[in-house]
Amino acid sequence: MKFNIIFTPGIVKYLRLFTLSLLKYSSCSFRLISNGCSQEEDVMLTSFCEIDTKLEYYKLPFEGLVEHSVAITHLQGIEDGDYFCFMDPDIIASGDFIVQFKPLLEQYSGVFSGTVIWLDKAGQTLSHTEKIMGGRFNITEYGLCLGSTFFAIYNNKILSNYLENTLITFDKYNSWENIPTDCQAKLIQSNLKMQRYDTAKVLNILMQRDGEKFIFRHSHHLYHIGGLSSLLVGPLSKVKQRGFIRGLNKISSRKYLKQIITRRSITQTKYIRRDVADYFTTILKALFEGKKLPPKFRIQDQKISQDMETARQLIVQMFDEYHHLLNL
């Protein structure tokens, strides 16, 4: 089983470390995708892929950086394996994650995972009051799986046949106005009419409407930081910089942290994402530059607090064990 991992400008140097954890704890192979990366980063990826036969380098045939949905559509088009798999580059593994998913592939056409570590169950559940189906939503309040582009495994034959027969792709139908009337009718019947849909949401909903079975399953061996790509890309991020020092000052406030976890608006969720991404980016840069690590990010929610601390420890342990492979 081969996973596509898409690297964007600014993250190659640091997030190769996360790929090493995937290699360490699974028998899977990984295709590392250059999406608009610089020549220096492409060389870095190419050299990195030479350390293990389970690694493969691939550069997207587009000019510059393209949207995630466009990249996924292209990658599915060239996939000739039994499964089409992809995951975000800022997911670090603590154990053999694939063992949990293999039995599910006999029952489901799509298996998803990889929720970001700072998001609780309520933040992953789409309520009927929402107008935008963002990427963080993996299930509706009625129990329908919405899937995820954080970590996805599709039965490639079933997916390819569906895409060919319906002409729906990962990069189409992100806004209501662009959705054909027959597909709109199915979404209305499912009580899922939205202003906008994140990548693959419409595809996943319609495939299930037409009889396929999908499931989202949390993995105790995958820790998804979330937001590192957009943070390190810098100017290409849609969220304003807020500053890590400002974040550390507020991080010490339990009241503020409680507000972070309970906020649900899209704008606020982006800021939560940036606060956590700021924290882990600072950890990575400190490790790679031989500097002191930042204070721990403490959150009142015990589950989220523990997951963030575990992710921090994993990053430090992986760096101590494998930094010699990163050509620092």
Describe the role of every protein-language-model region.
Residues 20-29:
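Short, acidic, metal-binding catalytic loop of nucleotide-sugar glycosyltransferases
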Residues 88-92:
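The conserved acidic donor/metal-binding loop of glycosyltransferases
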Residues 1-17:
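N-proximal low-complexity "stem/linker" segments adjacent to membrane-targeting elements
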Residues 99-183:
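Conserved catalytic core of nucleotide-sugar-dependent glycosyltransferases
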Residues 147-248:
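Catalytic core and acceptor-binding pocket of nucleotide-sugar-dependent glycosyltransferases
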Residues 84:
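Short aromatic/hydrophobic "clamp" motif used to bind/position activated sugar donors
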